[in-house]
A protein has these predicted regions:
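RNA-interacting cores
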Residues: 1-371
Length: 371
């Protein structure tokens, strides 16, 4: 049963401290709607935008870096965890019910900002159409550094739980299986970007392919929304990974394998981890992961179907950037079909309103010609 929050005043600043040399930390926010709220399925875009607005209001230099589309993102954001139900074409958050939201930092620079941020948090997270009171915040993943992870005790076997749908990019497509090479490539990218201890990617991943075994797995898949545009097929569940006997021939890679497993709860797995995908924890669990609201699944399936139609059409006509444009057309049209205004869609996608208006007209025309 969901836990109903006791009414109490918002307490700020929150008495959270951690060492200044910290590079990795995770925070858990308790958010409480004061009334029943209704959101469109892609609400994680709003969480992402609110977080970046918080950064931008106090540190313009860090904000510019976080908006850089070329670099690995030194933070992750979860979706809301709690009682979320479908209500027509929207999802509903219930009044006075606690929802959990997780934010992690993957670099010293970001955690420095977070340390100052939690001392002066706003009382309300202003999610579109759903003001959420920030009731409390606590440390979810303890402060540490990359060096401390690397020097920690070797774990030859560990399990990973994938709490939110997780997917990888492979040859231009989504790949919804936790193959060790894909899993550790995901972690190594963050490690090489933020640890200051870069490792040869090809050599390590070849070692992973040869010596890392999946000893147990329990997985399921679902179609989900993926950030600002498109939909993906992602997996949830758990896997157990072990070093094979011959892995000891390269002990430094064995130690890195162990460290990257401990990094997983901080950095998440796969892509779109700043939009709620890939939430990962250590340990095994056979429990069913929280259901994705039906309306989110319906929208994700509609976006995927439209994307395939538009991709096929644009390739026939020789259009450039076919995949990207097809995904945008599909996302805009599907969200409009669900009742969202084009103005809201334009704001979420950070596109000019007139461009979005043109795209939805072109998408409808293309769809009609296919009928």
């Amino acid at each position: 049963m969901p836990r109903r929050s006791q009414k109490k005043p918002n307490i700020a600043p929150y008495k959270l401290t951690w060492p200044p040399e910290t590079e990795l930390i995770g925070l858990e926010f308790e958010l409480v709607p004061t009334k029943d709220c209704y959101l469109f399925p892609q609400y994680t875009i709003g969480l992402h935008a609110w977080f970046l607005q918080q950064v931008g209001s106090t540190d313009s230099e860090l904000s510019a870096y976080l908006h850089d589309g070329e670099s690995e993102k030194p933070f992750t954001l979860s979706a809301l965890n709690g009682e979320i139900i479908s209500s027509g074409r929207q999802i509903q958050l219930s009044a006075n019910i606690s929802y959990r939201w997780y934010v992690t930092a993957l670099s010293n620079r970001v955690q420095q900002w977070m340390a100052q941020w939690v001392e002066n948090l706003p009382e309300v997270l202003e999610l579109k159409n759903a003001p959420l009171q920030i009731r409390s915040v606590k440390i979810a993943h303890p402060p540490t550094t990359y060096k401390q992870l690397l020097e920690s005790d070797l774990s030859e076997t560990f399990a990973l739980k994938f709490l939110s749908p997780t997917s990888f990019r492979r040859k231009g497509h989504h790949f919804p299986l936790p193959v060790p090479v894909n899993v550790f490539h995901s972690y190594l990218r963050r490690w090489n970007d933020f640890s200051g201890m870069s490792v040869d990617q090809d050599a390590f991943l070849a070692w992973v392919d040869d010596y890392i075994l999946i000893t147990r797995c329990q997985l399921t898949t679902a179609k989900v929304l993926a950030g600002k545009k498109g939909a993906v097929t992602g997996f949830t569940g758990a896997i157990e990974l072990s070093l094979s006997r011959d892995a000891a021939k390269q002990p430094e890679f064995g130690q890195l394998f162990s460290a990257l497993g401990k990094l997983a709860p901080y950095c998440g797995t796969g892509h779109k981890t700043t939009f709620g995908l890939g939430q990962t924890r250590l340990g095994w669990s056979s429990q069913v992961v929280q259901d994705i609201p039906d309306v989110q699944t319906v929208l994700a399936k509609r976006i995927e179907d439209l994307t395939q139609i538009f991709k096929a059409r644009r390739k026939r006509t020789g259009g450039d950037r076919a995949d990207e444009i097809a995904s945008k057309w599909a996302t805009i049209l599907a969200r409009r079909e669900m009742g969202e205004s084009l103005q809201v869609v334009a704001e979420d996608l950070e596109m000019p309103y007139e461009t979005v208006k043109t795209y939805v007209k072109l998408a409808r025309r293309a769809l009609k010609s296919e009928e």
